[in-house]
Regions:
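Conserved short hydrophobic interaction patches
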Residues: 22-27, 106-114
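Short acidic, S/G/P-rich loop/turn micro-motifs used as interaction or catalytic elements
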Residues: 11-12, 92-99
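Acidic, proline/glycine-rich low-complexity IDRs
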Residues: 109-175
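Hydrophobic beta-strand residues in large extracellular and virion-surface proteins
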Residues: 5, 57-59, 87-89, 103, ...
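Short, intrinsically disordered low-complexity segments
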Residues: 29-94, 132
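Secondary-structure transition/turn motif
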Residues: 8-10, 53, 142
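Short, extreme N-terminal segment that most often corresponds to the first beta-strand
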Residues: 1-45, 172-175
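Well-ordered, non-membrane alpha-helical segments in soluble/globular domains
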Residues: 17-20, 97-109
Length: 175
């Protein structure tokens, strides 16, 4: 299962990769030994990948400035979020249920670090959640699987206040 987390960041992407590694280690400190976490930094491709039992994340450090700007404008026009870093998330299917909970904890820690915009997307047309100018919105117009993933008990793992919002309705489309 593929997801994408896009965020605004003033950090260099290398520093953001290190920060994500530290957050993941903090979230999983009681569950994993450090030999279960694999970090790759391919110098020739300038790509950071962090993989472990539940999911892997990757950040492309080679993105050109014009690509980043086009991507930023697209997210601003489509979702109303100002982001400049794209983080790909690949879940391991057999551990998705636990991995999703761990990712929510990681996202919660990111939310508390700064007030930058953020959006989390799956393969649907509308994001699962987004933060705009410090306010977190959870999509209330979800399919059955998404509703299970975004239940109130699971969202408590974010440890961050949020409002529910129908992203489909608020985008001018009918359900």
């Amino acid at each position: 299962m593929d997801f994408r987390l896009s965020t605004g960041s003033n950090l260099p992407r290398e520093a953001l990769g290190k920060l994500l590694y530290d957050i993941i280690c903090d979230v999983l400190v009681m569950e994993l030994s450090f030999d279960e976490i694999e970090v790759k930094d391919w110098s020739d491709s300038r790509h950071i990948s962090i993989g472990f039992t539940y999911f892997s994340i990757s950040i492309n450090l080679d993105d050109e400035d014009d690509y980043i700007e086009r991507y930023r404008k697209l997210n601003l026009e489509t979702y109303g979020v100002d982001t400049n870093v794209d983080i790909n998330i690949q879940f391991i299917a057999r551990t998705f249920d636990i991995g999703w909970l761990k990712l929510l904890e990681v996202i919660g820690k990111l939310l508390r670090l700064n007030d930058q915009d953020l959006v989390v997307e799956d393969d649907s047309s509308y994001p699962l959640l987004k933060r705009i100018k410090g306010c977190l919105f959870i999509n209330s117009n979800l399919d059955e699987f998404q509703t299970e993933c975004m239940g109130k008990e699971k969202l408590e793992l974010l440890n961050y206040p949020y409002l529910e919002k129908d992203f489909l309705k608020d985008n001018g489309h009918e359900k």
